[in-house]
Structure formats: structure tokens, C-alpha cells
Amino acid sequence: MRPAGRSANQVRPVTLTRNYTKHAEGSVLVEFGDTKVLCTASIEEGVPRFLKGQGQGWITAEYGMLPRATHTRNAREAAKGKQGGRTMEIQRLIARALRAAVDLKTLGEFTITLDCDVIQADGGTRTASITGACVALADALNKLVANGKLKTNPMKGMVAAVSVGIVNGEAICDLEYVEDSAAETDMNVVMTEDGRIIEVQGTAEGEPFSHEELLTLLALARGGIESIVATQKAALEN
């Protein structure tokens, strides 16, 4: 029995609250159960130096956790003077995932920065960040079109992510913290809305997993992501 009584393939309740802050071109509070992340999308004219003159845009991301997002307080990374390896890995993942959602040539020479700040962590903060940031990105791109700065919306489709894993020998979808900390296998999967894979991060924490178990986990992830994408689209229609 899972902690919340969920079935193996069931994601936690997902809520996407748009326009959560007033200054950013796109802002979303995303909630996966008790995991809560504030995602904002900020537009700047111009691109990084390595892209200048190429007629395409860029999407980048930053990720962080509030000190008391977790069970015990973690000092701000700014106070330590440097970002941790986990933070850098996650923000690169978010940026890669969201670049797959956009035609960068159609975006033109704009840079969109996605800031994902974890308010409360209960497992799956990176997958929640990708899911919420995609909706914030969609709102920001819609504003570029509405303001006449772009003729065509460069959004190719939604992107979402979910964690899957093996806990006590059972493959399950969307792990909360107590499950994640006990997982024999832990995996994060990012997909497009039509089920194509953008990224898979999978690790055997204990017993190695088989090829068949990998396919089972990917199928679980696809089902979970289909449900999450439906929630994303419903949020954008409201």
C-alpha cells in the first residue's frame, strides 16, 4: 500500500495556478501533492554571445530551494558562495527539456529564463519544475505574440515530466519523499505531449534493474505524463 493509498500508476493530484505573480511574463505555482514549486518565465531581448547573429532564440533555467523547503533547514547556496552539483544538474535538465518544446528559430533573438523555486519538497521537485515551467513558458510566448513581437507562436507542444521507480519490488509512478528515499530504482522521465522521450535519468540505488523493468517504468512514465499533459492543457484553457 502506497502512503496516500494511490495505485501503482497513479500520479499525485497536480495543480497549476497561472499568473501567480504579477511581474513575470509567465508565472505558475505547480503542486504535485505536497511538492510546491514557483515557476516564472522572463523574456529578454537578445541572446547569449555564442548565438548572436544566428537568428534564433535561447531558453535557459535556474533552480533553487527555499531554506526550509525540506524537513530540516538548508543554508541558501548564495550564503555558501557557490551552487551545488545537484542544483546545476537540475537547472540544466529543466532548460534542455523546455528547449525541446520550442522552435528556437521561430522564437528569434529572445532569451527566456525559467526560474524554478521550490517552496516545499516532498519528492519530484525537478519533474514538477519542468511541468510548471512549461506552462509558464507557454504564457510568456503567448504574450510575445499578443504584443506583436512574434508573428508565429514558436511553441511546438507541451513537455512534462514524472518520476518512476521500484519500491519494495513494485514499479510505481510519481514517488513522494518516503517512497523515493526507499527506492531500489529511481528514474526521472521527460516526454513530449505525444510520448517522445526527451530525457531519462535512471539509477539503481540497490538491486540493478532488468531490461523488462526498464520498459515497465517507461510505460508507467508515459501514462503518468499523459495525465499531467491533460492537466497542463486544461490549465492553459482557463
Curated annotation (Swiss-Prot):
Keywords: Nucleotidyltransferase, RNA-binding, rRNA processing, Transferase, tRNA processing, tRNA-binding. InterPro entries: ExoRNase_PH_dom1, ExoRNase_PH_dom2, ExoRNase_PH_dom2_sf, PNPase/RNase_PH_dom_sf, Ribosomal_Su5_D2-typ_SF, RNase_PH, RNase_PH_bac-type, RNase_PH_CS. Pfam families: RNase_PH, RNase_PH_C. Its EC number is 2.7.7.56. Phosphate binds at R86, G124, T125, R126. It catalyses: tRNA(n+1) + phosphate = tRNA(n) + a ribonucleoside 5'-diphosphate. Gene3D superfamilies: GHMP Kinase, N-terminal domain. It is an enzyme of class 2 (transferase). One of its GO terms (biological process) is rRNA processing. One of its GO terms (molecular function) is tRNA nucleotidyltransferase activity. Homohexameric ring arranged as a trimer of dimers. Belongs to the RNase PH family. Phosphorolytic exoribonuclease that removes nucleotide residues following the -CCA terminus of tRNA and adds nucleotides to the ends of RNA molecules by using nucleoside diphosphates as substrates. This is Ribonuclease PH. It comes from Salmonella typhimurium (strain LT2 / SGSC1412 / ATCC 700720). The gene is rph.
